[in-house]
Structures are given as C-alpha cells and as structure tokens.
C-alpha cells in the first residue's frame, strides 16, 4: 500500500496563521489494518483512511498560536481564533472564538468599531 497526500485547506487570502497551529484534514484512523501474509515477503493489505474532510478558512481571518483546527471545520471571514483553541464545525463570519472546545465570545465588527472610535479620538 502507499500513502498519498490527502489534504485540502481552502482560503480566500489575507489569512494569518500563527506559530504551532495544527490543521487536520483527516483523522488517519483505520477501518482495517494489515490482514494477512500469503507467502514470504508478500502481504495482502486492506488499509483505508476512515475520514477525510477539508478545512475552509475565510478571508482576513487570524488563527492564534497553538490552535487546533479539526477536520471538516469551516471558519468564516474576518474571524479571530484565540491561541490554543480547539475548533470544530462551522464558525460564522466575524466570530471571535476561544477555548477547548471553542466558543464564540464576541464579534470582530464590534471590535473594529471600537478601534475606529479610539483612533479618531487620538
């Protein structure tokens, strides 16, 4: 049997991925392992990857250090993923998520509005 690279990470640009981030697109579990040996040096193999799901990261999203993105995750645009977060499922656009499992704690549009107000006051 042979290993083939099986991964897919879609993004639309402007994505920042910090250090030590792990993005998983498969779980490398086995349905069946090596089954039998017919003759000396001849093996019959039944290796199959159990699951494969690509990851999608929306434009202008930021993924903090040490975050883990699990297979099949879809991160919306303008999202912030907190450092060390474990992310699974669909993360809506403009979400700020943290934790294990991650939870939405805020909205980047609110953060942007506060930043703009402070910038104008300076």
Question: Model regions: which residues?
Answer:
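Short-chain dehydrogenase/reductase
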Residues: 62, 80, 96-97
């Amino acid at each position: 049997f042979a290993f083939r690279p099986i991964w897919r990470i879609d993004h639309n640009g402007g994505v920042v991925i910090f250090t030590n981030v792990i993005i998983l697109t498969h779980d490398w579990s086995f349905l069946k392992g090596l089954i039998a040996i017919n003759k000396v040096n001849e093996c019959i193999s039944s290796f199959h990857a159990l699951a494969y799901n690509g990851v999608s990261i929306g434009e202008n999203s930021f993924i903090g250090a040490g975050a883990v993105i699990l297979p099949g995750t879809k991160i919306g645009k303008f999202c912030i993923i907190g450092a060390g977060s474990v992310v699974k499922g669909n993360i809506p656009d403009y979400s700020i998520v943290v934790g294990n499992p991650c939870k939405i704690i805020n909205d980047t549009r609110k953060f942007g509005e506060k930043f703009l107000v402070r910038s104008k006051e300076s």
